[in-house]
């Protein structure tokens, strides 16, 4: 398999395992961006616990699934978004109000769209989950 984006490969393997009814999935390789993205997903209840295993070859992440995941995606290229333009991207990417999250990388770290609006920070779009 050709690795285009580590984050994209991670989200696709999690989504495919969730569709097949699996309870856990092993994601390789790991990175800081993937771990922060998974922590945002965990905070919103889309996945269960995850464990990072350092095997000195890129690392692995074991993710526990809970069946709440419908679709995930990476936004490529990573568009710049001002804090007052986040609402337009919510309407474009998410199916309905209150369903799903958009994850951004900001100067305050990797946040979901609600936290970014609360803190009045913009950033680059990473992906979406619903």
From Swiss-Prot:
Q: Which UniProt keywords apply?
A: Ribonucleoprotein, Ribosomal protein
The organism's superkingdom is given as Eukaryota
Any one GO CC term of the record: ribonucleoprotein complex
The keyword Protease belongs to this UniProt entry's keyword annotation: no
User: One matching Pfam family, short form?
Assistant: Ribosomal_S8
A single GO molecular function term of this UniProt record? structural constituent of ribosome
Entry keyword annotation includes Ribosomal protein: yes
Q: Which GO terms describe its biological process?
A: translation
> What Gene3D superfamilies does the annotation carry?
3.30.1370.30, 3.30.1490.10
Give the family, as the similarity comment puts it. Answer: Belongs to the universal ribosomal protein uS8 family.
Question: What is this protein called in UniProt?
Answer: Small ribosomal subunit protein uS8
- To which species is this protein native? Agaricus bisporus
